[in-house]
Every structure is written in structure tokens, then in C-alpha cells.
A protein has these predicted regions:
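Carbohydrate transferase catalytic cores enriched for Leloir-type hexosyltransferases
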Residues: 1-397
């Protein structure tokens, strides 16, 4: 079996879509090798797994394809082949290629299966002579809101015609069903987190957390999310922080890490005008790999966003051994389980109360940390990759 992974629409690896590909490829079983059709056949009466396929000498080759500029972006050391195609580098050209030339490209490269990680952005409408697998890691109804009517119709037509859709959470799956997509072909496979990067650090006893280019004085709360919309609830969190400071008189700071977006000006204004402006830090874009140390040094991770389809940041914070206080909306309760303390993001007083409890109640804090580390350990990329391959092998039998 030859599986192609489409890298178009993944922002040269600099977004969550690109990270998905990098982690997926780097966690492929090391003994997956080039497919040999004469090696064996899969028993149609069973539901085979990756282990079954390898035991029967069914050989699987995984290959990436996209523009030449991305040839080394997703290089994981796994010696995964990359096939490039000439392309003008813009989303419009990529979308046109997917609906005029990809069928011929797939046939030429003998792909039995194609995985589309950026299915909400670039996707064919027909899937001739191959098994298509769409990955949806966000709330599609939100993604399509600001797109043209013709593009919305094209993406939905592609998703209606594709054989398999993998949703990152039940919340995302339910959103897809509301858009009219067939329930039985939508499977939920949670994404993993990088446990080599996000893990509990027990040696952080300094008053200053040095995370280049910042040196952040402890104690602090951290919220990592782009300043992109009211649904991220930055302003409500700032108001909650103000109440926490008034109620406790404690020296805590609030660190807001994330790119400026359409809502940034309003958030900056509220922070600047706050009575506690000197304790509120908006540090802008923060490299993903630097979040591990930022989380590890924090009093707690706050995550008030109400429309998250995945919620990986709360898992990453849990894995770092800090309590998580987050919204009870979106996919967060599904992803967080019983480990976080949940709140109503529209209620700053409730958020402030949760912040105070996690600071003052040592038993509660210790319990949250213990539960968080155990829970986060269940989310790993090895499981994500194997579940995905098992689904593909079974569908392709």
C-alpha cells in the first residue's frame, strides 16, 4: 500500500496543520517499508491493524507531496520520500490544482491512499482510484464563515465525496454532522502531544523563568492563544485577573502569549487601561517549543476560549505538571477530562475564584497536577498514527 500525504495548505510547517504532518511522519512505525503487492493480502473477514499488516509482511510506503520549497520542511529522519510538483505559491493556485491535476498526479505516483491534513483549505471534489482521508482539526463551520460561497460549496462537496473523515474531537465531529456530512464516515482520532518537549520539570526553583527573549518573574498565570476573536475571551480573563488581584493582594502576573490578530487592538487597550497594567504582559508570538518552559514555570495555565475544536494547549500544560483552569465550552471538557478546573468564561468573578482556589488550596493544587500528568500521558502521537493507519488499512482491505 502506498500512502501519499498532501502538504499543500499547511503554511510551510509553521501552523498547526504543518505540525500535524511533522509529528505524524516522525511517529510512523520504523518498520513500515515499500509496499509489495505480491507479499500478502489482507483477510477481508477481519479488521486488520498495523501489527497484523507487518506480521503478514504487508509493506506500506508513506510519501509526502507538495511544492519543492517544502521538500525539507517535514524531514523527520525517517527517510520519507517527497515528491514535488511545479506550483505558483498561493492558495488559489493550490485549490485549482487539486481540482484539475491531482487525479493524474495520484495515478502517476501510484498512491492507493491520500491523506489531506489541510482538508478545510485545499481538497479535491472527486476521489478517483484512491482512498481519500480528510483530516479536520478545527471547527469547520467557523473556518468557512469568511470564505466565498463557491469555496464553501467546493469544500463541502469534497467532504461529502471523500471516503473517510478524521475529526480531532467529538465536538468537531458534531459540527461536521450539522453541516450535513455523513455520520458513519466521520471517525474521531485525537491528536497527540510531544512528550519529549512537554514534560514535568522539577528543577525550576528560580524566581525568574528565562525563556528567550523574555525573563518572566514568578509567580504568573499563562494563557497561550492568538488575539484573534472575542471567543478567545482575553478581555474577560483580564477582568478576572483584576478581581483576583483585588481579592488576594498577591504578586501574580498574567502572561498572554500569542500573535496579534483582528481583536488585538481592543485587548491591548483593555490591558493598558487596567489598574494592574504593570502585571499584565502581552508577549506576542511565542515559538511552540518555548511554551514548555513557559508552562512549567507558571502557577497555572488559564484557557478561557469557548470555541476550541482540539484544545492541545491544555494537554501540553498538563504534561508540564501545572494545574489547568479552563472554559467548560467547545472540546475542552472532552480533551481535558476530569483533570482541569472548569469555569464559565463569561463570568470573571467565577474565573477569579478558581484562580484564588488553585493558589491557596495546596491539596487541590496537588490533586490537579497529579491527575493532569496522568491524563495527558494518554495523548501521544504513536497512538494517533497507529489509529489512523489501522483505519486506513481496514478501509482499504
Amino acid at each position: 500500500m502506498k500512502i501519499g500525504i498532501d502538504t499543500f495548505g499547511c503554511d510551510h510547517g509553521k501552523s498547526g496543520l504543518g505540525s500535524y504532518i511533522s509529528y505524524f511522519v516522525s511517529n510512523l512505525p520504523s518498520d513500515l517499508v515499500q509496499f509489495n503487492k505480491e507479499a500478502t493480502t489482507i483477510n477481508a473477514d477481519t479488521e486488520p491493524t498495523v501489527e497484523d499488516a507487518l506480521d503478514k509482511k504487508l509493506k506500506i510506503k508513506v510519501e509526502l507531496f507538495g511544492i519543492e520549497e517544502d521538500r525539507y520542511v517535514y524531514n523527520s529522519g525517517q527517510a520519507i520520500n517527497y515528491t514535488s510538483t511545479p506550483m505558483i505559491e498561493n492558495l488559489k493556485a493550490e485549490r485549482l490544482w487539486h481540482n484539475t491535476k491531482i487525479t493524474k498526479f495520484i495515478k502517476k505516483n501510484n498512491y492507493d491512499v491520500v491523506i489531506y491534513p489541510a482538508a478545510s483549505r485545499v481538497l479535491p471534489v472527486k476521489f478517483k482510484n484512491h482512498l481519500g482521508v480528510a483530516i479536520i482539526n478545527s471547527i469547520l463551520s467557523n473556518d468557512l464563515e469568511n470564505e466565498s460561497s463557491s469555496f464553501r460549496k467546493m469544500i463541502l462537496k469534497g467532504l461529502k465525496n471523500i471516503q473517510i473523515i478524521i475529526a480531532s474531537s467529538n465536538f468537531v465531529r458534531n459540527d461536521l454532522i450539522k453541516l450535513g456530512l455523513e455520520e458513519k464516515k466521520i471517525k474521531v482520532i485525537h491528536s497527540g502531544i510531544d512528550h519529549k518537549l512537554f514534560y514535568q520539570r522539577l528543577d525550576l526553583d528560580n524566581d525568574i523563568v528565562d525563556v528567550k527573549p523574555f525573563a518572566i518573574k514568578r509567580p504568573y498565570f499563562v494563557y497561550g492563544s492568538s488575539l484573534s476573536s472575542p471567543e478567545k475571551k482575553h478581555i474577560e480573563l483580564i477582568h478576572a485577573f483584576e478581581r483576583f488581584k483585588k481579592n488576594t493582594g498577591l504578586p501574580h502576573r498574567l502572561v498572554l502569549a500569542g500573535n496579534d490578530g483582528p481583536y488585538a487592538e481592543e485587548i491591548h487597550k483593555v490591558a493598558f487601561n487596567s489598574e494592574y497594567a504593570s502585571d499584565i504582559f502581552l508577549i506576542g508570538f511565542f515559538p511552540h517549543e518555548s511554551f514548555a518552559k513557559l508552562y512549567a514555570g507558571a502557577e497555572a495555565c488559564l484557557f478561557p476560549s469557548v470555541n476550541e475544536g482540539v484544545g492541545l494547549p491544555i494537554l501540553e500544560a498538563m504534561a508540564c505538571g501545572i494545574p489547568v483552569l479552563c472554559s467548560d465550552k467547545g472540546a475542552l471538557k472532552e480533551i481535558g477530562g476530569n483533570a482541569p478546573i472548569y469555569f464559565d468564561s463569561d463570568n470573571p468573578d467565577q474565573i477569579a475564584s478558581c484562580m484564588q482556589k488553585i493558589v491557596e488550596d495546596k491539596d487541590l493544587r496537588d490533586s490537579c497536577i497529579s491527575d493532569s500528568v496522568i491524563w495527558a500521558n494518554e495523548f501521544n502521537w504513536e497512538n494517533t498514527v497507529r489509529q489512523t493507519l489501522n483505519l486506513i488499512i481496514n478501509a482499504h482491505k
